[in-house]
Each structure stands twice: as structure tokens, then as C-alpha cells.
């Protein structure tokens, strides 16, 4: 799912920041709009390699702040990052509780957070649709 979300961001003019995570359980990418755009908006996409409700709670209570600080202190983002960044969390639907999703999305600290849940069948169907219809850019 994270590859699909990243493709959407690339298709809409976002560029990837080169930042390495300090933790090995997450795959994450940071995106920004290059100079010349009228808004300063950042997105961070993340997918836990070992997905579980407990791992998602760790992201909420510990790792999101660490990730936020790593990106903020990287020297690769401007001051507006602190107020204009959305964390898109890709997580398999059956491996996260509704309560944890709400806790993540309602958390007011560091990032604005959105959880994108999916099933394996939904992801496979969407990927097949994109390939079968020759869709190269998703805007």
C-alpha cells in the first residue's frame, strides 16, 4: 500500500526527502513540494514491517515523536514542517483495532495523522485495476 500512496504523491508533484529511519520496524518516506509551489506541505508515509495493534500503539506513544524529531532536526525541512505535515499510516485492516485507529487520528501531537487500512484482497484488486487499465499517474 505504501508504494501506491507514494506513487500518488509523486504524481502530484511531491519530491522525496532523503532521510533514513533510526528504527528498523518501519518503512517510511518523507515528501515535500519543491520551491515554486504556493504552499508548504509535507507528507510522511509509513508502514510497519511487523504489523500489529501493539506495534501501531508503539508508533502512537513513542515512535511518532522520535520520527518527527529526526525529520525536524535533519536540516532538510523548513520551519513550516512542524505545522504542515501529515503522517499517512498504511496498515492492514485486520491487524489494528478501531480504537487504535481513532487514537492515532485524534492525537494532536507532532504530525496530523491519517490511517489508511486495507485488506490483502483490496490491495491486490486495486493494483490489478491500475495495471490492467495502464494507469501511470494517479492524481
Question: What annotation goes with each model-predicted range?
Answer:
Residues 75-98:
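Nucleic-acid nuclease catalytic cores
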Residues 20, 103-139:
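Charged, structured surface patches that assemble and position nucleic-acid processing machinery
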Residues 54-55, 96-100, 124-127:
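Switch/connector loops and helix/strand junctions flanking conserved nucleotide-binding motifs
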Residues 68-77, 98-104:
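Short secondary-structure capping micro-motifs at structural edges
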Residues 59-63, 98-107:
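"Short basic amphipathic alpha-helical interaction patches in structured regions
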Amino acid at each position: 500500500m505504501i508504494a501506491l500512496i507514494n506513487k500518488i504523491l509523486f504524481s502530484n508533484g511531491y519530491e522525496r526527502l532523503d532521510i533514513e529511519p533510526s528504527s528498523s520496524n518501519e518503512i517510511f518516506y518523507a515528501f515535500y513540494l519543491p520551491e515554486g509551489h504556493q504552499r508548504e506541505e509535507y507528507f510522511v508515509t509509513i508502514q510497519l514491517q511487523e504489523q500489529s495493534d501493539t506495534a501501531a500503539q508503539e508508533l502512537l506513544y513513542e515512535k511518532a515523536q522520535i520520527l518527527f524529531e529526526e525529520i525536524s532536526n535533519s536540516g532538510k525541512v523548513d520551519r513550516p514542517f512542524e505545522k504542515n505535515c501529515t503522517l499517512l499510516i498504511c496498515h492492514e485492516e485486520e491487524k489494528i483495532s478501531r480504537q487504535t485507529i481513532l487514537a492515532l487520528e485524534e492525537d494532536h501531537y507532532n504530525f496530523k495523522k491519517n490511517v489508511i487500512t486495507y485488506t490483502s484482497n483490496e490491495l491486490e484488486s486495486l493494483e490489478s485495476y491500475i495495471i490492467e487499465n495502464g494507469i501511470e499517474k494517479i492524481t
